[in-house]
Structure formats: structure tokens, C-alpha cells
């Protein structure tokens, strides 16, 4: 309703039922188009068309008005709105971001200068197309540069489809890389000692080689020979098993990722470059360049993009990628766009070489009762490096110490529990098992040893369920909706402070 859409395209009967339920509240709606009409053979509604009927309307119209399409194309100006993309809603209600044709084409050319898209690229599409990253890589990039887009069967088959497709370009949200790392780590714990030792030695060699590759430097002769042997014997088969043996350009974005995860993939020959941006910037703002990678940063601004920091550290962006405003929301537009600069809502710093490091979302940084500034994502990323922790939400605003809500990794914890013959029947049963709590406690303690005293998690609770976008707990790209979770699970949080 907010977007004033005239046409509603749905997949099949289930989605059609949902559309029919709300159409009375959509005064702009003229047609509902059904892609798969199975089960609707006898259904009749003057507002509903099948995809084929919709195409036939176009054929008839073009026959009667052969110049109509070209005439409409001729009236489109570069600064006309091309697409409305709604924000993920992590810090408030979703807002409709207006991106122009100029925004999109300018961003494509700037990103192409860094990534180098090719007409024969293979792309794996697994995020909702409502997300700017997926729209950019799975729709706009192929339309401009060519390539083949492969859509996953469903969210549960992403890893399997990754192996089948073996893409040449892959954009991965942190959860993808975390799951791949966890899968390899746990598999290697189960293999025989000889294979496990060979793997560990190989990764150690890869870690020695990685800093040279970050800088685009040739490896010293001895290391080059050793790494070549390791790559041939272990790493190349491992990349093939993961579906990463053909990948040419690998990007991680949409949320912060732990440098340890990035370092691991570089060590096995998968050169992930971190990319940073937001919907209001048509997607990318900065990215690592080949031969100039700094783990823990998001690289340098794209060609033509300016980035500076406000006095409070907020990241400001200016360039051809910056949007024109929020649809029907002048107040939010005025807050986000000031003097030609986009106020990102993120806080960051530049290192001595101009690489941008993201501290956290401005709204997420909190101050403890002792007056210490805490960036929770830094701690959460360390916790999620554990193969047994799928998600973590760190809490401590105006509190005496930090606590965390933990979501276990179901697959890995299940395997761990079965190896120890622990009795359980459901996910909830597993998550609340005393020995599982002990496992997570050890993982939390390991992280606490790597951070300062104010950043240590003193207590935690394990959530009895997974986090779902449908429940308003995470975004479609699996970013945690912090405020919603803190409100929903207040009854678990407060007891963690009750005995303090």
C-alpha cells in the first residue's frame, strides 16, 4: 500500500490468497498476476490474471500501439525514480528508498571498475530480491554486463546449490561464511588424526601466505613451493567440496564479519573482500581492492564516492550512488540527507592508509553503568566465530556488566550432543540441556579471554528457539533486530541481572 503499486505479482495460490486478503486496503492496485496458476483452473476474478494472460495483454497492446513502448522509454529521464527498495528495518519501520536510473547505472560502473564483471560470470542468488545487494548482483549486473544467474531452490539448500553451481562471483552475508567455516571445522574434528594434522599444517601455511596475497606481493620462493604443494594436496579439493573452486571475485557484506573468519578463508585460498554500504547508497560505498586488503576494515571508497566522518564519528557519504530521498517521508529524508551528504547511521574510523573501519551502528553503541562505551557487534562477531553459536545479542546499556542471548547452531550442537549420547527430542530440549549450556559457557569464556574486562560477557541465556524473519527477529539478510529481541525476551534478560 505504501508504495502505491498498481500491479501485484505473486507466485501461486498461497500468495494469491494473501493478496486477496489485503487488496481492499490497496486503492492503487489494478491487477494481480499469478506466475503458477496450478489449482486455480476454475478460479475467476476480474482483477486476477495468469502470467500468460498478462503477456497476451501486452502482445495485443503492442499490435495496436506499436510505438507505445519506445515512446514511454523516450520519456524516461536519468533522474526519474527507477526502483523503490525498502530498508531492512533494523532500527525502525522500513522506509522506501528512491533510487534513480542515474544512481543505478553510476553505481554499476563504479563497482565494475573494482570487481570486473564478465559476460560469462555465474552468479548464485539466494537473498530476497527486495534486498539491494541481491537486486544489484542478480538483476542489474547481468542486465548491464551479462552472465548467468542461478537461483537456489530454497533457503535450506544454499550450501548444496553452492556446490552444484560453483559460481564465479559470490556475494555472501556473514552467516554464509560462518556456516561454511563451521562445517569444515567440525568435519575436520571427525576425520582420522593423519588427515586432521595435514589440514591444520596446510591452514598454517595458508595463514603465512595470506598477508602477502592481501598486498598482492609474490610469495617468497620457499613459501611459494610449500603453499603450492599444500594447495594441490589439500586446499584445492577443499575448495571444490565447498563449491568455491571457480570463484573469481568473492565479497562479504550486509553485516559485519569477524576478521578471524575472513582470515581463515584467505588461508584456504578464497580471497574474500569485505564490502560496505547501504540501501540509501545504491548498495556499495567502500570495498577492499585487490592487492590492498586490510582485515577488520571495509576497504576504501568506490571510485567517485567521497566518505568523511562527522565529529561524533558517523560515516557521511557523497557520490552518484546516494539516493534522492525516502518515498513519502520528507522528515526522514531531511534527517538522512544534509548538504548533499548521506548520514549513514554507522560509526567508523579511518586507519593511517585511508581504510575505513566500521565500529557499529550509531544507535547500537551503548554505555555501561561504569561509563564504558561498548560496540556490541564486535563482541557478537567473536562469539559467532564459535561453530556452536549461530547468533548472539550482547546487552548492557546502563547496566553494570554485559550479558548475552545466545542462539545455538542446531546442526553442529546436535552432532556434538549425539556424539556424547545426550538425550533430547526437540530443538528446545537440546538448547536447554545442562551439558549444552556447559559447552556454550566454555565458548563464551574463550571469547572473554580475548577482550577487555568491560567487554566480557558475564552471564548468558540460551534462547529456546531459532530467530526468524517471519517473527520480526531478524531481517531478510539475517541481521538481528536488536530492539525487538530485547523487548521480546525481557523475561530472559532481567534474571541475568537479578542476582547482581
Q: What label would you give each PLM region?
A:
Residues 1-57, 439-445:
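Structural core segment of the AMP-binding/adenylate-forming
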Residues 48-52, 59-86, 93, 116-122:
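Conserved pre-ATP/AMP-binding loop-to-beta segment of ANL
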Residues 82-108:
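Conserved AMP-binding A3 loop
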Residues 87, 301-368, 385:
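Conserved ATP-binding/catalytic segment of the ANL
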Residues 150, 223-228, 240-253, 257-313, ...:
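Conserved ATP-binding loop and adjacent catalytic segment of the adenylate-forming AMP-binding
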Residues 322, 337, 355-384, 413-434, ...:
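Adenylate-forming
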Residues 391-394, 400, 444-500:
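Conserved C-terminal "lid"/linker of ANL adenylate-forming enzymes
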